[in-house]
């Protein structure tokens, strides 16, 4: 290799500096890959390439990593900084073997044998010029842009045409000390490491580019030849008394309506547009957990992303983030309502496939869609769908629609060999563009049909939207899930493949709820959500600035010292910083008087801000319930607090998709935190410290509306134990409306009929709606709920129930 200060390399670096734009994956290798700056480091690359090393040199200079041009000097030993598995491919003839790599690696291992204190980190580095996966029928393009083994001439063309799409990916370091100690230092281990490295680089390329893309028409013909679709076409012809040719044409129409038409060229163009858009909209996008997803891809998993659905922006945000995190944007299941011109064709070429809201018993459409989904899984394309079925209008997660999850499960049951893993994704925003529209819809206004004019209208309103949040939750591998739920599932299916197992529907329901729980486990507590939570807990949605900052400091400390889960992310900075962020986003207003500053939510924005509060209400609902127990009792035993929370937790879990593994332990951790912060003292019982009562009262207010709902339900059940589920839902809803009118409750979810439906299902499951119900349990929970209400609210509920049911 020429010297790094030679005229040739200086010229090459100058050319690349003007032609090449490099994206680094991950963005911070030290933090994400646990690199140790104190230990010597060498880079491992697949192929020797001057242009690749020049691109790597630019990146290492920016990241503060050793330059690939500098020799590795460790304990008096001088070695190359870059080790390549294979030499450059000449324009004609064959490339040299891997002997130089083996010799270099043997030298490094020999040094470790001689010097026990030495530990060199080997960091694999992959470079990609463009990320086109190629098509099954590629010809000329593949010949010109052969990416696996390009000659220097092809590499020049790649830099010229694809230089703006250069990716450098760092992988986890390998300790040579560990290799030498565990596996020895002979030539055999050198050969083994070379094989492992080749497999690693091959897998990394698959993760970065994805599988080859099929010709769309060839895909259709392949699907139509499948046994299940041929059978469905025959049944369609028989049932509708049409010819099989006509039924086949209908199936082709369905395929054309459904199938994506992924275009790498469009994705590259969209990447530039979205980069401009995100920079215009957001001051930053916070990402947590991407490394675990990259590892799943690397390990050969079929990935299904299941994000929550807040906004139409969700379709763009997740794909953009995955692209920049070195993964292929997924094929996205989009509602057929988004298939309007010109957005529909663009979404389709960006990887969207379209699904009808309801299959309406259309067996042929169902068979076509299922076969298409199976094909995506079989060919290794990652998939994304929204299990809620639509955007949340309240900020809370919606009850999951199980159709797509059931079809994914059926694909596994039909014999996909690779592990299929659902990756829950929490998407959050400091500003959701549709919030105002959502609340108009909740107040009864008819939902507008999506059109291009709505898109232009949204773009017209672009402004400072703060930050976005993408948190990847705990993955769920379906084969492992099935092993837990039905250990003999493989045997059962082998014995009778056509028979639907009795355990399948319950298993799908459990899985859907686990996905939603894992999404909420990965919530992002931001400046807007936290400040909304505090201000909406006050009577006038306003608080003195210093008190607001103090309350936010308490919440931040709680989330860090008693973390909800390891997947949850918490805003950086202190309460003062969070308040300032919210003010800069114009989410809150501040006014000054002689006694200080007051931060508030404008009356016109109060309902809208409940949306952001509801994004994270589940993180604080149990601490809030504990605070309510403490502030409504002068003294209370610790065990009584644990018991009260245990009684309400099943309903909270059903309503808010909570996943606290050990509720008593969590309650005790929160109580210990309150004691540590000086809010509570404990002798034989727990007592609130008077000067901190206001902080606990503010925290307790966050659960008040939830307790009011439970008080309504259990007062009704105590008054009429034999009440039917449908009757309980309707009467609870009517009583909630009365309570809201009398006490000024404006939160949309308080009047949500679906929420009362969810609670009634859980009540039946818990035995509270059974004929042989234990009335003492109902009375106990009613009394507990009543005891935690304001006297005026309690009086309204009790009087209304008594008046309604007095005979």
UniProtKB/Swiss-Prot annotation:
One of its GO terms (molecular function) is glycerol-3-phosphate O-acyltransferase activity. The HXXXXD motif is essential for acyltransferase activity and may constitute the binding site for the phosphate moiety of the glycerol-3-phosphate. Its main location: membrane. HAMAP family: Glyc3P_acyltrans (MF_00393). CDD domains: LPLAT_DHAPAT-like. It is found in: Cell inner membrane. A motif (HXXXXD motif) lies at residues 308-313. Belongs to the GPAT/DAPAT family. Pathway: Phospholipid metabolism; CDP-diacylglycerol biosynthesis; CDP-diacylglycerol from sn-glycerol 3-phosphate: step 1/3. It comes from the Bacteria. It is a peripheral membrane protein. Its EC number is 2.3.1.15. The keyword Nuclease does not apply. It catalyses: sn-glycerol 3-phosphate + an acyl-CoA = a 1-acyl-sn-glycero-3-phosphate + CoA. It holds the Pfam family Acyltransferase. One of its GO terms (biological process) is CDP-diacylglycerol biosynthetic process. This is Glycerol-3-phosphate acyltransferase. One of its GO terms (cellular component) is plasma membrane. Keywords: Acyltransferase, Cell inner membrane, Cell membrane, Lipid biosynthesis, Lipid metabolism, Membrane, Phospholipid biosynthesis, Phospholipid metabolism, Transferase. It is an enzyme of class 2 (transferase). PANTHER family: DIHYDROXYACETONE PHOSPHATE ACYLTRANSFERASE, GLYCEROL-3-PHOSPHATE ACYLTRANSFERASE. InterPro entries: GPAT/DHAPAT, GPAT/DHAPAT_C, GPAT/DHAPAT_LPLAT, GPAT_PlsB, Plipid/glycerol_acylTrfase.
């Amino acid at each position: 290799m020429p010297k790094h200060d030679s005229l040739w390399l200086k010229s090459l670096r100058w050319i690349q500096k003007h032609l090449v734009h490099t994206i680094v994956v991950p963005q911070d290798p030290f933090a994400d890959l646990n690199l140790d700056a104190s230990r010597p480091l060498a880079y491992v690359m697949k192929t020797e390439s001057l242009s690749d090393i020049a691109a790597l040199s630019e990146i290492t200079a920016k990241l503060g990593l050793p330059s690939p041009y500098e020799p590795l000097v460790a304990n008096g030993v001088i070695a190359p900084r870059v080790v390549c598995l294979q030499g450059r491919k000449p324009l004609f003839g064959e490339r040299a073997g891997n002997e130089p790599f083996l010799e270099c690696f043997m030298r490094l291992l020999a040094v470790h044998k001689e010097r026990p204190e030495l530990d060199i980190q080997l960091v694999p580095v992959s470079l990609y010029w463009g990320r086109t996966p190629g098509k099954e029928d590629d010809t000329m393009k593949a010949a010109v842009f052969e990416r696996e083994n390009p000659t220097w001439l092809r590499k020049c063309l790649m830099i010229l045409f694809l230089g703006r799409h250069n990716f450098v990916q760092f992988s986890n370091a390998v300790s040579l000390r560990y290799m030498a100690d565990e596996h020895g230092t002979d030539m055999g281990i050198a050969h083994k490491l070379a094989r492992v490295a080749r497999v690693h680089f091959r897998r990394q390329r698959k993760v970065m580019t994805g599988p080859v893309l099929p010709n769309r028409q060839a895909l259709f013909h392949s699907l139509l030849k499948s046994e299940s679709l041929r059978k469905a076409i025959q049944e369609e012809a028989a049932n509708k008394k049409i010819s099989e040719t006509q039924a086949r044409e209908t199936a082709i129409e369905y395929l054309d309506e459904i199938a994506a038409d992924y275009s790498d060229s469009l994705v590259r163009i969209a990447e530039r547009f979205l980069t401009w858009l995100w920079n215009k909209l957001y001051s930053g996008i916070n990402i947590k957990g991407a490394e675990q997803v990259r590892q799943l891809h690397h390990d050969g998993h079929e990935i299904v992303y299941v994000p929550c659905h807040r906004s139409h922006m969700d379709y763009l945000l997740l794909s953009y983030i995955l692209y920049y995190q070195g993964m292929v944007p997924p094929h996205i299941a989009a509602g057929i309502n988004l298939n309007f011109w010109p957005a529909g064709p663009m979404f389709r070429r960006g990887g969207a496939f379209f699904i009808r809201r309801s299959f309406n018993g259309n067996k042929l459409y169902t068979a076509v869609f299922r076969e298409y989904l199976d094909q995506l899984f079989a060919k290794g394309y990652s998939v994304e769908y929204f299990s809620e079925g639509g955007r949340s209008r309240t900020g809370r997660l919606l009850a999951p629609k199980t159709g797509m999850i059931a079809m994914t499960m059926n694909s596994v049951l039909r014999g996909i060999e690779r592990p299929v893993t659902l990756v829950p994704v929490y998407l959050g925003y400091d500003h959701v563009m549709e919030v105002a529209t959502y609340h108009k819809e909740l107040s009864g206004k008819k939902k507008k049909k999506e059109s291009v004019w709505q898109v232009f209208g949204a773009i017209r309103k672009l402004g400072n939207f703060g930050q976005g949040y993408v948190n990847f939750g705990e993955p769920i591998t379906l084969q492992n899930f099935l092993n837990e739920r039905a250990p003999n599932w493989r045997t059962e299916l082998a014995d009778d493949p056509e028979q639907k197992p009795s355990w399948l529907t319950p298993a799908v329901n459990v899985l859907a709820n686990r996905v939603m729980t894992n999404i909420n486990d990965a919530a992002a507590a931001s400046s807007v959500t936290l400040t909304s939570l505090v201000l909406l807990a006050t009577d006038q949605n306003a608080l003195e600035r210093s008190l607001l900052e103090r309350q936010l400091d308490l919440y931040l400390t709680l989330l860090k010292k008693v973390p909800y889960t390891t997947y949850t992310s918490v805003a950086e900075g202190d309460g003062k910083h969070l308040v300032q962020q919210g003010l800069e986003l114009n989410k809150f207003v501040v006014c000054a008087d002689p006694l200080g500053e007051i931060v508030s939510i404008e009356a016109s924005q109060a309902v809208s801000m409940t949306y952001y509060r509801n994004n994270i209400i589940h993180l604080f609902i149990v601490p809030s319930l504990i605070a309510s127990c403490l502030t409504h009792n002068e003294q209370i035993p610790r065990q009584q607090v644990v018991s009260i929370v245990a009684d309400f937790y099943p309903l909270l879990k059903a309503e808010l998709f909570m996943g606290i593994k050990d509720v008593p332990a969590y309650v005790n951790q929160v109580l210990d935190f309150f004691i540590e912060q000086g809010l509570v003292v404990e002798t034989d019982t727990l007592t609130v410290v008077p000067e901190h009562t206001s902080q606990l009262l503010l925290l307790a207010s966050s659960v008040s509306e939830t307790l009011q709902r439970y008080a309504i339900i259990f007062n009704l059940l105590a008054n009429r134990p034999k009440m039917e589920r449908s009757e309980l839902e309707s009467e609870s809803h009517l009583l909630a409306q009365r309570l809201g009118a009398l006490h000024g409750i404006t939160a949309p979810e308080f009047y949500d009929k679906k929420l009362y439906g969810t609670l009634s299902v859980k009540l039946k499951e818990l035995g509270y709606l059974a004929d042989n119900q234990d009335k003492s349990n109902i009375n106990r929970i009613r009394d507990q709920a009543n005891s935690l209400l304001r006297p005026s609210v309690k009086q309204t509920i009790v009087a209304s129930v008594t008046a309604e049911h007095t005979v």
